[in-house]
Regions:
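Hydrophobic cores of alpha-helical transmembrane segments in multi-pass integral membrane proteins
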Residues: 2, 8-99, 107-126, 143-159, ...
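Cytosolic, membrane-interface loops and tails of multi-pass inner-membrane proteins
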Residues: 126-138
Length: 230
């Protein structure tokens, strides 16, 4: 954890972690060969867009390497094995940049939470087109998101976030996010098409609350703006 706690609430870190999570999801899904290259193109594009601010920051060469890898992975998306490996390299490069910026724990928890929730939401749209696809990947991404949110909560407790005062907003957001993603897992057990529809809709809400939980928890620790531990 960095000595300057304000770095863990810096928007650049959150964007780097988000980009890392998306790129890693693109790599894993590409290697699993469950959907076509369209998912890789979309996820790589969103990852590149989210990570773009870091690319133009001074000295962030890992982020630039990640962007290059995303472009190459998108170009090779029809070769799923090769593209999957390149996307994993991109995600790792973004994660390294985030770790250098704010420390390993802060970067990894945000990457897991944002990557799992966003990846489940995006991949869910392919299941809406073809609900016969195996749902294991969706369930696994949802579980990764839940694990990341739980780790994020543990990190904030370790950094001194309590359960009263201004910290209440964080706990409402993180508990709501975990509840929504748990509901996603439950909806995916329902074999009908409506189960995938419900899971995808719930993941949209979970993404909003997850973003809020990640930022508010860190802002509490850093003492930024109106956020206060008391």
């Amino acid at each position: 954890m960095p000595a300057d706690l304000q770095s863990i609430a810096d928007p650049r870190l959150i964007l780097l972690a988000w980009a890392a999570g998306l790129a890693l999801v693109a790599g894993v899904v590409s290697l699993s060969r469950i959907v076509g290259p369209g998912f890789s193109w979309l996820t790589a594009g969103v990852s590149a867009l989210v990570g773009l601010p870091a690319v133009f920051a001074e000295g962030e060469w890992w982020a630039r390497a990640a962007l290059l890898a995303l472009v190459l992975g998108a170009l090779w998306a029809r070769n799923k094995a090769l593209a999957g490996v390149v996307f994993l390299v991109a995600g790792t490069a973004y994660l390294v940049e985030a770790i250098l910026f704010s420390g390993a724990l802060s970067a990894v928890t945000a990457t897991l939470a944002l990557g799992g929730v966003t990846g489940e939401m995006v991949l869910g749209h392919w299941y809406l087109v073809d609900p016969r696809l195996p749902r294991l990947a969706l369930r696994n991404l949802a579980l990764v998101g839940i694990g990341g949110l739980a780790a994020e909560a543990g990190l904030q407790v370790a950094l001194g976030v309590g359960v009263t005062g201004g910290a209440l907003a964080f706990w409402v957001l993180v508990v709501t996010s975990i509840a929504l993603m748990t509901a996603v897992v439950g909806a995916l057990r329902y074999p009908a098409y409506s189960g995938v529809m419900a899971a995808t809709g719930l993941s949209y809400l979970a993404l909003l609350t997850t973003l809020g939980a990640v930022f508010v928890g860190r802002a509490l620790v850093a003492g930024l703006g109106p956020f206060d531990l008391t």
